[in-house]
Amino acid sequence: MRQFRTLAMRVRSPEASAAMTHAARRIGLPVAQLPGDPAEVTGLRSADGVAWRAAGGYLTTLIAGGVDIRLHGAGPSWFAGLPRDVTGRDIRLVSVGEAPDLVGPCPAVAKLADEKHPAFSAAWVRNADDLRNRLRTARLPADSTLIIMDHWLDLASEYRIFTIGREPVAWSPYVVEGEEWSPSLRHHRASWHDEAATFVALMLADLPAEDVPPTAVIDVGRTDAGDFAVLEVNNVWSSGLYSCDPDGVLRAVLAANDPDCAPRWRWQPAPALGA
């Protein structure tokens, strides 16, 4: 992996920002705190050994403005291609224009495939007309991509796992029996975070080498019956830490910035989702 000279970072949570800064200092990596306005970013380029860690919309705005940023990881198509016995449901990746026809008269879960948008969060829709109404209200561009899932999973707990290759490097619970994340949630009697990380490791071990992403954030749920399922896949450089080991998270962030990753894993952000 390349030796980086700077970690360019903007993290909204003061606690997470401090944790990442200390992790970088432990390996002798200087940190450049990015300004609130992307237009003020100057002199930082991936080609010069800069690693990036910031919200997807912020980085999308920088890329649209011509800043050299090269990031890699598992994208929506990788998630949609996982087998049903891993995800627990049927998952389709479709354009906004195609999505209502795919949903038809049946209920489904709909969410944006990449990043977040304040006008369109993951939602349970009753049918195609319900989805059309939500899309009309959100005013998403016609070329936006959605993930459509055939049902909502009833979960007892949820977990976040950062990976590099086939290896989980940091993990944490973020919901356990209805209790939202706090620093003490890791000690909840019903938290199965280590088992969730093992589930992810076994899942990645079963994939062909060419289908293992260089890095990923894999969110996993556990049902009341004790079954694990992959809920979604997020970008390493923009995902929250919860109680994940910041040293492991930093390793994953640097892996996502590695220019030697295969081209198929290069992040191609949707311009409409810029900050």
Predicted regions: what they are:
Residues R2-A205:
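Active-site nucleotide/adenylate-binding loops and adjacent lid/helix of ATP-dependent enzymes
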Residues M149-D150, E158-Y159, V212-D224:
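A short glycine-rich, hydrophobically flanked beta-strand micro-motif that places a catalytic Asp/Glu
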Residues D211-P213, D224-A275:
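C-terminal active-site "lid" helix and adjoining low-complexity regulatory extension at the edge
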Residues D114, H151-L153, R222-D224, N234-W237:
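Short, flexible loop/turn elements at secondary-structure junctions
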